């Protein structure tokens, strides 16, 4: 299928061609027709699936079909962080370059005057973080009486960052009659309950978790004791060609600790996670993109806003308990056919995660032994506990109409 077959108008098709889009991703193919029909939608998709385009493109088409009053916000996209909000707004601007629709992003951590002046000029589509949006609403600067489309993006991350209460306050303010688009990578109970409160007879779109890695990524395992991991990282960074390295840490505290130790070794490094202010996260990301900072240490949730096309090096300081996370982490490199390299540090506590990860991707990851911190004990442990015939995990089927399992309560979603 191509974008023309999705029924998109020529101004949008032309903009997509400029962006180099040729074929829709699975979530775009499934979601765009339903959103064009103005249905509510519940989408489960990870970062890197083309999710933003899946809702931005049909929103632009639906709004372009009617005469717009610039003093009335018609679409609101609510997202948890400044960096994600900026990224979404950049996408809206790219897709709408041939349309008369105007989008704006607002977020906290900066003075509000400039954002207020832009709002006064008129906006069709508003991308916002919860706190700044509520500030503007309470001051009477933003009115949402004419809102037609509400998008809640990264709902699980909203929960993780403590924004669910703010989201519920916003829901009480916006018109009850509207189209709702709800996206979440995971579906914990509280998020499922929130979805049931918001959505009306939704179309459910679930993109199966990615289980394969790009052939352009050179993957490797380093067996190393936990206490030697930072020393190993510093050892690898002695190679100056590793000029831009994204390091994944399992915890916020761990990310800070790694960044401090690298800094103490005269290696420029910053940490990015949910406890950092939006200003601090954006500054760290900007420094990393411009290569002022050589190493960015991130937690998985914070890394969702990181989109760097030419990133070549990713380090898994620990392996995640969720095997699919490995695929998403190393998928930050080796994009669009370019070459990338991933280094994964494995200690005794990581062995079970390594086995499940290799089962998911259907292949063994090569082990690098020629480094000062290699331990044969870990190799033997892995070999002894993994001597069964190796078979890859079957890939889950992708289903567009079968999403999350409904709880026994039949009223999971409101009916019209």
Segments predicted by a language model, with ranges:
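Conserved helicase RecA-like core
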Residues: 2-377
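Basic Arg/Gly/Lys-rich low-complexity intrinsically disordered segments
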Residues: 262, 290, 355-416
